[in-house]
């Protein structure tokens, strides 16, 4: 039994391609989904997730390594790891020598030190002849102590020399393959995803978001970014106007989101254009850079909130116009969660709210619910049940997207 949430698998590239259909079929038969998928020159990553009948969620990351390399420079060939593999009665696994060298050689090649938390593994193998042989052959250093003090430039130079000796002009092909995947993943990849939450006060957004992050924590605890309403590339409109001398006083009573009075169509349009600039520029500077590398961006309220809650955004424009405008100009998130509940349930949670305001927001939510990319989720029971509904939507949609990307 393996409790790890990150499993490294050494496999030849053509072998993974051969068994991939069977692997996907097995994942689906077990009720799991491929949530994120990354393809690079040295590995393929699948983050797989499932939601159980009791509404709990599990995630596991599978890294299929073709070889240990950096910038297309091979440090350890997979065939060597597989050749010296061991069998524990259930599965084949790398021996301690290659378990150590895989991490150590990569860390040294990027200029990092071998983590102290793995010192027991190092102590087990540091005097092993196999370790010394690879350090001499690849890095040109007589032992680990010398290699520890070497800078990454001289180590990479030695590794590159060995690559030309081992692969000849194939070394150039390896580098070009690295560059191809690097540029493609930077410009075209969308391996992560974004989620936005919209709903009336009392719908439980904060609790559900916190629980969602907790449920995704095994793999995405350090791989998610949280924003409130917009990317905030630009400051609050009132603060900007105050700094420019256009406005004398700034209302900073954020405990009352619906405190402002109704604004004119012109004022609403100015606000919309200002926020649009933040959404558009901020998306490509802050959001896109995250979701292209298997990470998650979460918004507590997004542009959808402008459509649903005019009193909060103080943008009093027609809902259909705002939706059409958003489709044309505002970068869309992958999943727009319309989190709500009945007015009776919300009023039971927050007595200070007014039923008319809740119903107005819920009507706009119903208008958006059938639009592409919008998902209405009722939070009438426990927050975990709502989170489970959301994760089932996301996992299934991501799985279908990733199957298409693998074709």
Residue ranges with predicted function:
Residues 197:
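Hydrophobic anchor at the beta1->P-loop junction of P-loop NTPases
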Residues 156-171, 344-407:
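NTP-dependent small-molecule kinase module
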Residues 231-313, 320:
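ATP-dependent small-molecule kinase phosphotransfer cores
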Residues 205:
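Conserved lysine of the Walker
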Residues 219-237:
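Short beta-strand-centered segment that lines the nucleotide-binding/catalytic pocket of NTP-utilizing
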Residues 301-367:
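A glycine- and Lys/Arg-enriched "phosphate-lid" helix/loop adjacent to the NTP-binding pocket
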Residues 208:
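Hydrophobic positions on the alpha1 helix immediately C-terminal to the Walker A/P-loop
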Residues 1-7, 11-193:
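Conserved NTP-donor binding/palm subdomain of two-metal-ion nucleotidyltransferases/polymerases, i.e.
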């Amino acid at each position: 039994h393996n409790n790890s949430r990150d499993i490294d698998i050494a496999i030849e590239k053509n072998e993974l391609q051969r068994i991939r259909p069977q692997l996907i079929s097995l994942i689906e038969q077990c009720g799991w989904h491929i949530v994120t998928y990354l393809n690079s020159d040295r590995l393929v990553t699948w983050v797989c997730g499932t939601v159980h009948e009791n509404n709990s969620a599990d995630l596991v990351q599978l890294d299929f390594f073709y070889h240990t390399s950096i910038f297309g420079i091979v440090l350890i060939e997979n065939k060597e790891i597989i050749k010296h593999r061991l069998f524990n009665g259930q599965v084949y696994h790398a021996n301690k020598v290659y378990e150590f060298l895989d991490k150590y050689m990569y860390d040294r090649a990027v200029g990092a030190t071998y983590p102290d938390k793995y010192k027991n593994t190092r102590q087990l193998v540091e005097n092993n002849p196999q370790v010394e042989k690879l350090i001499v052959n690849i890095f040109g250093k007589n032992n680990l102590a010398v290699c520890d003090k070497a800078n990454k430039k001289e180590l990479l130079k030695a590794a590159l020399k060995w690559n030309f000796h081992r692969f000849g002009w194939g070394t150039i092909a390896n580098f070009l393959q690295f560059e191809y995947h690097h540029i493609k993943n930077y410009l075209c990849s969308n391996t992560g995803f974004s989620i936005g939450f919209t709903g009336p006060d009392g719908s439980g957004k904060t609790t559900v978001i916190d629980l969602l992050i907790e449920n995704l924590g095994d793999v995405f605890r350090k791989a998610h970014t949280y924003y409130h309403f917009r990317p905030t590339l630009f400051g609050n409109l009132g603060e900007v106007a105050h700094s420019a001398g256009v406005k004398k006083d700034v209302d900073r009573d954020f405990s009352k989101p619906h405190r402002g009075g109704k604004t004119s169509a012109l004022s609403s349009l100015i606000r919309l254009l200002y926020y649009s600039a933040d959404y558009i520029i901020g998306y490509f500077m802050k959001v896109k850079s995250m979701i292209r590398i298997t990470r998650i961006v979460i918004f507590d309220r997004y542009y959808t909130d402008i459509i649903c809650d005019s009193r909060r955004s103080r943008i009093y424009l027609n809902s259909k116009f705002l939706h059409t405008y958003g489709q044309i100009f505002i970068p869309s998130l992958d999943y727009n969660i319309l989190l709500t509940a009945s007015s009776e349930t919300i009023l039971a949670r927050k007595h200070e709210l007014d039923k008319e305001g809740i119903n107005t927001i819920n009507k706009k939510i119903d208008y958006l619910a059938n639009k592409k990319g919008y998902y209405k989720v009722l939070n009438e029971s426990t927050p975990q049940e709502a989170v489970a509904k959301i994760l089932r939507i996301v996992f299934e949609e991501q799985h279908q997207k990733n199957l298409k990307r693998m074709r």
